[in-house]
């Protein structure tokens, strides 16, 4: 479990936009927002970067990395979620992200799985 945690800390998300390559540590990313194939990645202290991709490409790249779809335009990093509300969720950055009714069940399941894995790793270290 410790190996997995260390590997996750070193993971980077890379992207290209206008001929430049961007690199962001995965743990700094709070969410992705996509509008007509233009993706905005939100990270750090309110920073953003943009690149082109489809939601399907993005979901494929982030598969198994604790990101979940909340809405047709949003993909959220599960460790950033602090509160579920009726039609949105609050991130630890203070931002509010919409939840589409279509994604509610799968989002709650993904979050529950994430919390279970977190508790498993924590209890192994005791």
Question: Model-found features: residue ranges?
Answer:
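Inter-domain helical "communication" segments and dimerization helices
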Residues: 1-12, 110-126
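Conserved binding/recognition cores within well-folded domains
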Residues: 1-99
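A short, terminal or domain-edge coil/loop segment
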Residues: 65, 69-70, 104, 120-126
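C-terminal structural segments of small proteins and small subunits
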Residues: 98, 105-106
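DNA major-groove recognition helices of helix-turn-helix
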Residues: 58, 106-107
């Amino acid at each position: 479990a410790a190996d997995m945690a260390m590997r996750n800390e070193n993971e980077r998300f890379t992207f290209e936009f206008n001929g430049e390559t961007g690199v962001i540590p995965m743990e700094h990313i709070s969410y992705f927002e996509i509008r007509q194939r233009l993706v905005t990645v939100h990270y750090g202290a309110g920073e953003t970067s943009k690149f082109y991709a489809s939601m399907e490409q993005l979901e494929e790249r982030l598969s198994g990395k604790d990101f979940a779809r909340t809405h047709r335009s949003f993909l959220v990093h599960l460790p950033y979620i602090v509160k579920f509300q009726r039609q949105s969720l609050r991130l630890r950055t203070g931002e509010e992200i919409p939840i589409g009714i279509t994604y509610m069940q799968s989002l709650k399941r993904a979050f529950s799985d994430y919390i279970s894995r977190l508790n498993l790793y924590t209890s192994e270290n005791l």
